[in-house]
Amino acid sequence: MDLPISLQDITYAENYLAQGDLATATPLLERLVELAEEYIDAECKTEENRQYFSFDSKFERLAYRRVEKDPRELVQVEVPFDRRYSDMAFAYIRQQDYVSARNALMQAVRWDPMNCNYRLDLAELFRALEDKQEWASLSFSVLERASDGRCAARAYANLGQYFLEPETENVSAAVGCARLALRLAPGDSHTTRLLSKIHATYPDAADESDEHVMGELALQGVPTSPSAEIAICLIMCATDAASDGDKQEATRLTVRARDLVGEEACAAIIKLVRESDAELNAERKAKRGAASGKADDAEEAGDAQ
């Protein structure tokens, strides 16, 4: 079955969405979803050894493999199905149809599970629908997937707000989340709101030591730093980009890694990746040398005969 939609079709509908023309954009997007789902049912069925995705980049694909440890063959589809569902969710949100928006964003996450903005927006929809546990769970899931400081900060800010809810109150954990969010994205509005709420409601919380509040987060199972695995993936992709001569992309990815885990940790990861690449290249060179030696020996034996 031929793919019935194209990137141009999605972009065409997005133009109406950007203009606020929901009356035109919504039926266009719904038709694209209908056509795409017919294609998905016929051509993209999940199998035991194969799954289909619409990752945005090579980095996301690598990060998914390392974080999820999914052994299946990962097949990249030709059209960004995730964008189509995200657009659909946005249209539903504008119409205050939060249940339909939630369902659409869940599909966006399914097609690009490494897009943390989808996860965070979906978390807010669950919160609007009064499912605070799922709001917190999705925010938590961002921490091991976030590839930039802003997304990680927003996830920490959400968890901080969760720890201020009456039924789950843990002020020390909330303070810990606020401090981590502040380090990652000091100007983020979610971070600012959390800090303001803590300051207004619990003014003495500022006196708690970092050791105490980070220890409380550890007890709650919340990591106190973004994922080193994600930073490694960023540096690996930066190294590949540099090898391909794309210095701009290499710099962009390296800066993301630095902003995520800090300059010292980033430098250590760069050193580790370079050493690993050097070892791998040495092994390949040795294998080629051994293979060449065997070929020469075989040729000499043939000449002797």
Protein language model regions, located:
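Short coil turns that delineate tetratricopeptide repeat
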Residues: 37, 79, 113, 147-150, ...
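Alpha-helical linker/edge segments of TPR/alpha-solenoid repeat scaffolds
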Residues: 53-72, 130-137, 164-173, 199-224, ...
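TPR-repeat structural position
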Residues: 22, 98, 132, 169-171, ...
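TPR alpha-solenoid repeat register
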Residues: 84, 118, 152-155, 191, ...
